[in-house]
A protein has these predicted regions:
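Short coil turns linking two alpha-helices in DNA-binding domains
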Residues: 30-33
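DNA-binding alpha-helical recognition surfaces that contact promoter or target DNA
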Residues: 36
Length: 112
């Protein structure tokens, strides 16, 4: 690993840089909570060579959203399902917007 690679990873939201303990500390939660959302398949941490869970910044943002919902009284399983559905809705909206742009572009090309 070169120094350039190491610095690039600092900006990589998907790089699994955080141990379970550090991730829990950053989120103000417990390692048990991180295990629970992992078991609910909301996030799947990568494993280090020694088998320890490692989390990315992207995964920590998802975990933070789950924690918000749980702190408001939503059961963990339901919070995970809500986040998954929110993500699916966002993806569907993105696809629909791209389709609309392509359709409008095709109509303008045909009219010209």
């Amino acid at each position: 690993v070169t120094a350039d690679d190491a610095y690039t990873r600092l900006d990589d939201d998907d790089y699994p840089a955080y141990t379970m303990g550090r991730a829990a500390e950053m989120l103000g939660t417990t390692q048990g909570f991180l295990r629970a959302i992992g078991e609910a398949r909301l996030i799947t941490p990568l494993r280090s060579a020694g088998g320890h869970r490692r989390y990315s910044r992207y995964q920590l943002r998802i975990a933070a959203r789950a924690r918000e919902l749980v702190d408001r009284g939503t059961p963990v399983e339901a919070a995970c399902r809500i986040i998954i559905l929110e993500d699916q809705l966002e993806e569907a909206q993105r696809i629909n917007a791209a389709y609309r742009r392509a359709t409008e572009s095709a109509k303008q090309t045909a009219a010209a």
